[in-house]
Amino acid sequence: VNHKNIKTGPIMAALLVAGFVGLFSETALNIALGELSQIFGVDATTIQWLATGYFLTLGILVPVTGILMQKFTTRQMFMASLFFSIIGTVLAAVAPVFSVLLTARVIQAAGLAIILPLTQNVIFTIFPPNKRGGAMGVMGLVILAGPAFGPTLAGMILDTLSWHWIFWITIPFLLFSLIFGYFYIPNVNETRQVSIDILSVVLSTIGFGGVVYGVSVGGDHGWTSTTVFGTIIVGVIALILFAIRQTKMENPMLNLKAFKYPLFVLGLAMNMITFLNMLSMLVVLPMYMQMALLVSAFATGLIMLPGSLLNCVFAPIIGRLFDKYGPRAVITPGTILVVIGYGLYGMYGTETALWIMVVTHIVMMLGIGMVLASVQTNTLNALPKQFYPDGIAITQTSQQVAGAIGIAVMVSLFSAKQNGYLTDVANDLPAAAASGSSLVFKISLIFAIVNVVLSLFMKKPK
């Protein structure tokens, strides 16, 4: 790729705005689920599908994008992504019944499933290795800001307008992205004749779909129920068969040779732990603040805002530090901040001052910001160029699956501990919620400590 005549600014703007909207939509609806279950007259388990369905679609489609990026041009993939995003968003905004809204969510997620891997692939193609950290830092900002701002902005919208506006508000941004992309995005990938192996797609769908589905409904059906246990087992078996098939094929759907690179595997593990912890925290923390500290949804969003904002300010700086000093200088201090954050969260009860929550969240988000983009950059830098599409598909899929598992398991533990407290200790809901979140944050703390240890083995790929 000739780096001279490529206008990186407009290209990044088009890709990142579309990515931001997709990730914003991923979490923005969570705050409206209670209201929507009443409007559509469906129960809490059913309404949860608006979130689960989104995750499930990502888990199923992202593995396939690795091969699609080799079959279709960058521009074709970009246009397809925006087509899905815009159609899905408009359909969601006008949805008269639950089934239409759910369908719209799946179409929206399809758009995001394409744009995330595509953005990473374009960054790794249009930026030379010494500038990738900075560019990935900006992408990391978007990956964190989208889900983090979702609940805050949605809370404001729900207070003033109706839930439809959670969708309408994003349309101008998607149109901006479409126009910029149309004029500026070049074809950066070399396409080749790839035949898509149907059996691989089926195994991957059953595999990732089964695991994400099984884990997502675990809390409702009980972890030992046949539905949950069965779908997870079937999913795992399908994934094993999928992996075996990939290693035997000449042109695999997902090239697993990426796993031969130790730094890639190390980064992948750290990335999964970070996502498992982060996405479950973004769900459990608002539950703790609303149930134990009794603050409104809107106030919860405001408490979490400074951490998210500072993260946006620091993301590009962290990226430049990574480019200059290498991975360990940024990642290890970041993992230590995350450990401090979870250690503090685990000690909070029903009397915690709100300013303490703000400060802790800032520490936490800074730590995550230092870890996330840097780990992703280093993980992919460990691979030769021809493995980028596969490496990206593997990282993106594993983080979606880890996030889905994190949310499902941590919310289940939160509820179980909370209910146990109510029956065994006292009928005191705030204290029960605090005991539930405390358990979750202590478990997350253990994962966070594992990440500190793993970060010590991080180094710059040769």
Residue ranges and their predicted role:
Residues 2-3, 130, 178-205, 247-262, ...:
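Flexible interhelical linker loops that connect adjacent transmembrane helices
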Residues 189-190, 205-228, 243-248:
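Phenylalanine-glycine-rich, low-complexity intrinsically disordered regions
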Residues 181-185, 214, 420-424:
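Transmembrane alpha-helical segments of integral membrane proteins
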Residues 90-91, 156, 209, 213, ...:
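Alpha-helical transmembrane segments of multipass membrane proteins
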Residues 62, 66-199:
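Helix-loop-helix hairpins in multi-pass membrane proteins, especially solute transporters
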Residues 422-435:
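Short, membrane-exposed interhelical loops at transmembrane-helix boundaries
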Residues 56-60, 90, 144, 148, ...:
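Hydrophobic/small/kink-forming positions within alpha-helical transmembrane segments
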